[in-house]
Structures are given as C-alpha cells and as structure tokens.
A protein has these predicted regions:
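Short, Lys/Arg-enriched N-terminal segments with co-localized hydrophobic residues
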Residues: 3-23
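Alpha-helical membrane segments of multi-pass proteins
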Residues: 19-325
Length: 325
C-alpha cells in the first residue's frame, strides 16, 4: 500500500504542476465573498483578538496565570489561520467542486488544526476552559480515550459513506452541524494525547503511542475505500444537479444562477475517478505525517523524562568514594 501511495503522490504532483494554477484562476468567477468568506474571517479575527487580550492585558486578573511562550502563541495563531484558510478561503469553495480539495480540507481541519489549537493554549487557560459545564460533561463522557478514539473515526468514516456524504453535502442545516460535531470529536480525540494538565492525564506515554497507532489503523478503511474504488462514489462530484445543490451552500444564489455552469467539469481538472483516488491518498499521507510526528514527539518527550528521572533517582556516593577532579 505504501508503494501505491507513493505512486499516487507522484501523479498528484505532476497534475498539480500542470493544472493546479488553472482551477484557482477559474474560481474568481464565483466572487470575493464565496472565495474568502468575510464573515468567517471576522469571526477568526475576533477569536485571535480575544486570545491575545486574555493572555496579555487581562492575564494579570487571573490567579497563577503565567506568561504564554512565543511558541504557544505561534501554534494557536497558525491553527486559526489554517482553520480560516480551509473553511473560509478558496480551499473550502474548491472542496465543493473537486474531491481532492475536499480531502485536503478534511485532513488539515481534523488532523492539523486541533493539535495546534490545544498546544497553543496555556495550562491556566485550559484549566478554566475545562471547568465550563458543557466541556466538563463532554470530557467525562465522550472524552474518555477509547470512546473519543472510536467516536472520531466512526464519524469520519460514516461521513464518507456515499449516501451520507451526498446528503450532508447538499444540506444547509446538516452540513455545518455534522462538520461541527466532527470537529469537536477531533478535539476530544486529540485531548488524551496532547493534554498538558497533570491532574487530567488518562494515558501513560507508551499508551499514547499505541493510541495514535490505533487512530491511524481505524482511519485506513475509509481512505482505502476511496483510494481503491473502481468507479466514482459521490454524486456531488458527478451529477450536475447534485453538484449545483451543493454549490448553493457556499456561493450566493444570484451569482450561481448568473454563471450558467453545467457541472464541476468546467474547471478542466483531472478525471473524476483520478480526483477521487487522489483525495484518498492526500488524506492518508497527511494523516500519516501528522500522526508520525506526534508519535515521535511523545516518544522523545517520554525518553527525556525517563532520563531525568533516572538521573534524579541515582544514589549519591559518600564523599570518600567520589572521584576527585
């Protein structure tokens, strides 16, 4: 399977180099609002303003609130910027037109953004967030490691069943609700691994590594279904009527009606089946890179702590047995 993924990756690179710029140019016909979502941009700016006010100006009002490191600030800002780009920028619009863009959006939204946001929050702020009743209830129920693991991967897999995918993609209400639930489940899935609070640790370091391996295995069937399918699976990207209905979720109705488009093939992108397989490969590769990075991070942190523990527990020799310099 690794060889197949690498082969597909090479083909993706060639297609992107040859045709990748052309679709982005064509997206301008949908207008600035559809491409950059000013409302969502305003929301993300407000989140960043609130974050910097809390860790800066108002930090002195919070007991035991320490200064937030530049690294943590970088993590949080990067997470918010990526969240905007995949949900408010051109990637979101392109994800309604071609499946590979949709899977790029999914990969970043659920495997990259949540860990960055969690790593960007200081301990003293996290302690107050988890005291919120709703958050506390979620962590005590579906936030348990095994439940969170199964919940996220089940929701992700169910979402990409063709019958569910097409129904959700074309629903004004179902689409944002399902994606919001999936995002919360992603945060809960990452919590047992990246939670820095000593009083809320539920997994040892070695169990965290096993947890991430299990995550990768559980996500594989959904990606494999997409990668190895011999026919296009989703009507949203093949049936003009279904595609047009899905496009209504992100493009103003008057703009869409004035364009007189017949389907997603107006972009001149790669064949639908190739695009679908490419999407599965992109999701799997990004997931493997992120999960592998986190496993490495957890392992080396564990090894460093063990060395420090051994050093601190080493017996101190009496003066007459110590080697003189």
């Amino acid at each position: 399977m690794i060889n197949l993924l690498l082969c597909k990756l090479r083909r993706v690179s060639v297609f992107f180099i040859m045709k990748g710029v052309y679709p982005m140019n064509n997206l301008w016909i949908f207008g600035f609002e559809a491409l950059w979502s000013p409302i969502f941009l305003s929301m993300m700016i407000l989140v960043l303003v609130a974050y910097f006010l809390i860790i800066g100006k108002y930090r002195s009002y919070i007991p035991h609130a320490e200064k937030v490191s530049k690294k943590q600030q970088f993590y949080f800002v990067t997470g918010i910027v990526l969240l905007y780009l995949v949900k408010g920028g051109p990637i979101d619009l392109l994800g309604h037109i071609i499946f590979s863009a949709h899977m790029t959006e999914m990969a970043i939204l659920y495997t990259v953004v949540p860990p960055l946001l969690l790593l960007g929050l200081p301990n003293w702020l996290l302690e107050r967030v988890i005291q919120v009743r709703v958050v506390r209830l979620l962590l005590s129920t579906v936030g348990k490691p095994l439940v969170a693991l199964l919940l996220f991967n089940a929701l992700f897999s169910i979402y990409h069943l063709p019958v569910v995918f097409d129904a959700v993609k074309q629903s004004y209400i179902g689409h944002p609700i399902f994606l919001a639930i999936l995002f919360v489940s992603a945060l809960l899935m990452w919590w047992p691994v990246l939670n820095p609070l000593p009083d809320h640790q539920t997994l040892s370091e070695i169990k965290k590594i096993g947890y991430m391996f299990a995550n990768g295995m559980l996500l594989t069937p959904a990606c494999a279904l997409i990668i190895f399918a011999s026919t296009p699976l989703f009507a949203t990207y093949t049936d003009p009527q279904s595609w047009m209905k899905a496009m209504e979720l992100c493009v103003p109705a008057d703009t869409l009606s004035s364009l007189q488009l017949t389907g997603p093939d107006f972009l001149g992108w790669i064949p639908v089946l190739e695009d679908q397989q490419t999407g599965g490969v992109i999701m799997k590769i990004i997931q493997e890179i992120v999960y592998g990075t986190v496993i490495g991070y957890v392992f080396f942190r564990w090894a460093r702590r063990e060395r420090e523990k051994e050093k601190n527990e080493a017996p101190v020799l009496p003066p007459y047995l110590q080697t003189k310099p």
